[in-house]
């Protein structure tokens, strides 16, 4: 029998032609038969054709869809989704959705993709607003280093390695909030119930020294802690049991930050390096070098970049992961007038406003606003948390007969910063007993204190802050989480006596849905 490979193509063509001729003859026979046969033939051919179409649709739905048709289909689906969300928020019929409202939502999404969306929350906070406060004490006996939240659960951690899980129990006020639109400042009453806790077991996969920082993954599945033992421990958020332990750092882990919308994590350490991790694959990605001193803080948003502060090297660095480059911003170069006469010795904390702006806090009490397009700060606010009281001569000298000359008062450090991403609201903390809220001006060239009648009062040193937005529409609120204690987060440089170690949660109701404004581009 001959191999089909060696057969001549002419024979194959002839066979194909003969096959087609046979089909034509069969069709002619069917036409000669009655109309019943025609109906049967048409029915069979249509069913075969429809079955063939179903198979194509099941296997490849978008095979025969052009690029323009696909864009049109996706745009219609997106508009329908936005309209449904607006209807749910406003409580009116879809036909009544105004074009301006829909256009503002589309503009908001575009600005969010560009990283230039600025939500105006500060103008929606009534100065006479009623703020509800809850204190998280639980089993914590050491200073807290972090308080984070995901949906209805709150997690707190202290230096001893104790991690406590809380559940929020919300009770609405008796008066109807739908009618007053927060004009008289109604808030949701806060109650938190401890439901689980976990202590460090000092084992191979757990911490063996003090904890310094706390973070939670964006999907709420993992709780991550860093400590003085050079370790990063990943725990299950449900059971609080340690699942993984990374020992890549060569010194104490000082800070953790999650990339927004992903499970990519950045960690900074006293070994002067930043490491990038993936919580999805539970793997190490890369290491970033450049700082000359201990890296005390790191923060990140949606893009593949992060901002870090290097302590006494007095620099802030923007790390561009994809471009494999970094931008260096040097502090301490401003005039003595801008710092109220106090020299800057260390940059201790950082918070990103958007992809192009961030704020830093220093040990001389200065909060600085930076842009990635300029090497110098756009604006500095000196003595943001005031001065410490003057010490008595016997307190600052070891001599039996100290010199009566008084030492000038020293500024309170900025121990923590936090911001709502892509908004004009951020918060700062120290050990003066108050969390201060700040309003960024339009154009992002300055900021000022946000005045409210009821201060956000806490006890002790504010070691960590986090801000989040809760609810939608008329029920929207800004929630502030604070981790406080008798000592600072990474040492006993400042100790306060008679202060409980606890966390605090504040609910600040908003009057209406926040508006969106464009951020002006700042030229160098």
UniProtKB/Swiss-Prot annotation:
Residues 21-32 have a biased composition (Basic and acidic residues). GO terms for molecular function: snoRNA binding; U3 snoRNA binding. This is Uncharacterized WD repeat-containing protein C2E1P5.05. Gene3D superfamilies: YVTN repeat-like/Quinoprotein amine dehydrogenase. WD repeats lie at residues 131-176, 206-245, 248-287, 290-329, 342-380, 409-448, 457-503. Keywords: Nucleus, Repeat, WD repeat. GO terms for cellular component: nucleolus; nucleus; small-subunit processome. GO terms for biological process: maturation of SSU-rRNA. Residues 51-64 have a biased composition (Acidic residues). It is found in: Nucleus. It comes from Schizosaccharomyces pombe (strain 972 / ATCC 24843). Residues 1-65 are annotated as: Disordered.
């Amino acid at each position: 029998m001959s191999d089909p490979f060696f057969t001549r193509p002419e024979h194959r063509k002839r066979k194909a032609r003969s096959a087609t001729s046979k089909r034509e003859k069969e069709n002619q026979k069917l036409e000669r038969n009655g109309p019943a046969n025609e109906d049967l033939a048409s029915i069979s051919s249509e069913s075969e054709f429809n079955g063939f179409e179903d198979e194509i649709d099941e296997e490849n739905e978008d095979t025969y869809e052009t690029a323009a048709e696909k864009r049109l289909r996706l745009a219609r689906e997106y508009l329908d989704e936005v309209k449904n969300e607006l209807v749910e928020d406003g409580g009116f019929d879809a036909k009544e959705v105004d074009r301006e409202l829909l256009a503002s939502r589309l503009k908001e999404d575009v600005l969010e993709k560009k990283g230039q969306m600025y939500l105006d929350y500060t103008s929606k906070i009534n100065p006479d607003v009623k703020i509800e406060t809850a204190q998280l004490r639980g089993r914590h006996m050491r200073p807290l280093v972090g308080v984070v939240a995901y949906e209805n659960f709150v997690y707190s951690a202290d230096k001893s390695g104790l991690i406590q899980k809380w559940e929020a129990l919300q009770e609405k006020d008796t008066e109807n909030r739908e009618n007053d639109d927060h004009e008289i400042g109604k808030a949701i009453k806060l109650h938190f119930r401890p439901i689980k806790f976990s202590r460090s077991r000092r084992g191979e996969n757990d911490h063996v020294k003090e904890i310094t920082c706390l973070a939670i993954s964006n999907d709420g599945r993992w709780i991550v802690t860093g400590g003085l033992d050079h370790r990063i421990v990943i725990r299950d958020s449900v059971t609080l049991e340690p699942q993984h332990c990374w020992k890549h750092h060569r010194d104490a882990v000082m800070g953790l930050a999650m990339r927004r919308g992903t499970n990519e994590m950045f960690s900074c350490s006293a070994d002067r390096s930043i490491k990038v991790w993936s919580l999805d694959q539970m793997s190490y990605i890369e290491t970033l070098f450049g700082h000359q001193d201990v890296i005390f803080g790191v923060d990140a948003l949606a893009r593949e970049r992060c901002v870090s502060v290097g302590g006494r090297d007095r620099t802030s660095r923007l790390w561009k992961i994809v471009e494999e480059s970094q931008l260096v911003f040097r502090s301490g170069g401003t005039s003595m007038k801008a710092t109220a006469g106090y020299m800057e010795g260390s940059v201790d904390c950082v918070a990103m406003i958007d992809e192009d702006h961030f704020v830093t806090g220093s040990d001389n009490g200065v909060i600085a606003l930076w842009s990635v397009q300029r090497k110098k700060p756009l604006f500095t606010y000196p003595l943001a948390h005031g001065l410490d009281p003057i010490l008595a001569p016997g307190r600052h000298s070891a001599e039996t007969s100290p010199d009566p000359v008084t030492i000038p008062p020293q500024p309170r450090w900025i121990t923590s910063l936090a911001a709502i991403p892509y908004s004009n609201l951020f918060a700062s903390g120290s050990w003066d007993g108050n969390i201060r809220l700040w309003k960024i001006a339009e154009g992002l060239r300055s900021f000022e204190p946000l005045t409210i009648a009821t201060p956000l009062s806490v006890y002790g040193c504010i070691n960590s802050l986090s801000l989040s937005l809760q609810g939608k529409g008329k029920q929207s609120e800004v929630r502030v989480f604070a981790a406080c204690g008798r000592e600072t987060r990474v040492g006993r440089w400042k100790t306060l006596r008679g202060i409980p170690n606890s966390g605090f949660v504040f609910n600040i109701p908003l009057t209406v849905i926040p508006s969106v404004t464009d951020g002006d581009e700042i030229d160098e």
